[in-house]
Regions:
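A short, structure-level motif marking secondary-structure boundaries and short turns
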Residues: 1-2, 83
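Short acidic-aromatic low-complexity motifs
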Residues: 2-27
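A solvent-exposed, acidic/Ser-Thr-rich amphipathic alpha-helical stretch
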Residues: 17-19, 25-73
């Protein structure tokens, strides 16, 4: 069974507003830092519909893959880290986010997110010779 952090990350990757909001408790204490901005919300729908799926990954951002996902615990607080492959304006990016959270039951009640921003995806370098 997936924990709340993994469900959150997978819902972000799927751009599924209903599933994303369902990971969070009513009255969530949500704060996040992205390059250039601090975000706050107390409603699961505000986090899902406005912050994550409108501003961070709006209609022009196509999430093409979940490149990494780890979960853990730090002194009783839960942790999830995930890396998304995103195409925006014809360019490929990686977006990594780290989140620490607490739960009430199976829903996130407190969450802090730190985002690396849209970072250019590495371009594979073609081999120039075959090594034997």
């Amino acid at each position: 069974m997936m924990n709340a952090g993994e469900r959150f990350a997978r819902a972000v990757a799927a751009k599924d507003a209903v599933a994303l909001a369902a990971t969070m408790a009513d009255g969530i204490d949500f704060q996040a830092l992205t390059p250039g901005r601090h975000w706050q919300a107390v409603s699961p729908r505000e986090v899902a519909d406005e912050i994550v799926l409108r501003f961070w990954f709006g209609p022009g951002a196509d999430i093409t893959g979940l490149a990494g996902l780890t979960t853990g615990e730090v002194g009783g607080r839960q942790h999830v880290a995930y890396r998304l492959q995103v195409t925006r304006d014809g360019r490929e990016y990686l977006v990594e986010q780290q989140a620490y959270y607490d739960t009430e039951g199976d829903q996130i009640s407190w969450m802090r997110v730190l985002c690396a921003g849209y970072r250019p995806a590495p371009v594979p370098v073609p081999a120039v010779a075959t090594v034997r």
